[in-house]
């Protein structure tokens, strides 16, 4: 299977979830073997240089997965666009923005899926590299854990736990095996969510200024405040899977393995990536020159070529 990039550049504007400011975002094609890179067009000189994404640049995970370079350049809330890039198997792209934060759009990855569909996706000449998990790797923190296990495909299982009545109306656990399920149908529409008391607290600290009922599910003590309700009965846990897929794709390559998590979040997801990469016996790089040898979870990528 070959690497892929966008067929053409495409732009969109939106609002930063935390800054509340307008953000102009452009996705560009990029050369093979260049990976996913970001560039802040509002910064000059070295601060405005291209940043090649790696797990080691995620140095702020308090509210999202945020790039912080050694020069202090920030690119925040990258997990939703990374999740969409993962769904389309984009290996190489340059993402330019004129603000410190990717726009939140509607709180899901669906607007970014539409962007990729509009831009088109094309194969390149170099072989796509997959990161294959060879043995279990687990990271535990207080009251939460995540792990990779070997699996001939890509499967994600997550469990959430919140002490609010609204979360008791659906299962706290969701599992998706991409050998038989579609990311676009099952995951892409799930929106980020937050609690009313947290919204008030964040705004008091000049955070969450761009959040509203059009780009997040807002929950009070007992119910969902969005008049249209939920897009999936278990939208909360599905969004956590959307986030996890984006967090894991920060490694820059599709993963062959099973990911499980209990109360996972951006920090522990990133810690798991780093733990895998730190142990050379835990993984290997693989290529598939014959697409018939691809694990079934990645067959759908062959249907997503256009341009």
Task: Provide a role label for each language-model segment.
Residues 1-91, 96-307:
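C-terminal regulatory domains involved in ligand/effector binding and gene-expression control
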